[in-house]
């Protein structure tokens, strides 16, 4: 009988966890890897945001008189293209709305970041070249 109590007590102590353990991770709820159980932020937060490119009617008419294709870039990475007649919108579209070029980007360190976006023609002539601050967890419209 003493052996059963001893084994039972041993099992209880073995199953207890160390509640004093410090958990490192990301404490920012805007980050994709946010962990509410984290005690100390270790700088590992990963942020993500969607971006949609669109032309207003004036830009579509102007570019249509200049080129047959426009290419979209974010930080020198090709995102997509549109061919004449260009898709345009009178108001900012939603990210990933059909007919518009969208992309998702990731970054580290803070909940907003600066990106460089460009719009070129098929011969790599640059029509737009801008820097823009974007926020994590949102749909950012450019152009």
Residues covered by each model-derived region:
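Generic short beta-strand
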Residues: 24, 70-71, 117
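Bacterial Sec-dependent N-terminal signal peptides
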Residues: 3, 12-52
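Functionally engaged cysteine thiol sites
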Residues: 26, 45, 88-100, 135-140
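Generic short beta-strand segments
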Residues: 55-58, 85-86, 120
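Short, surface-exposed binding/anchoring microloops in extracellular/periplasmic proteins
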Residues: 48-77
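Solvent-exposed strand-loop boundary residues in beta-sheet-rich modules
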Residues: 30, 76-80, 123
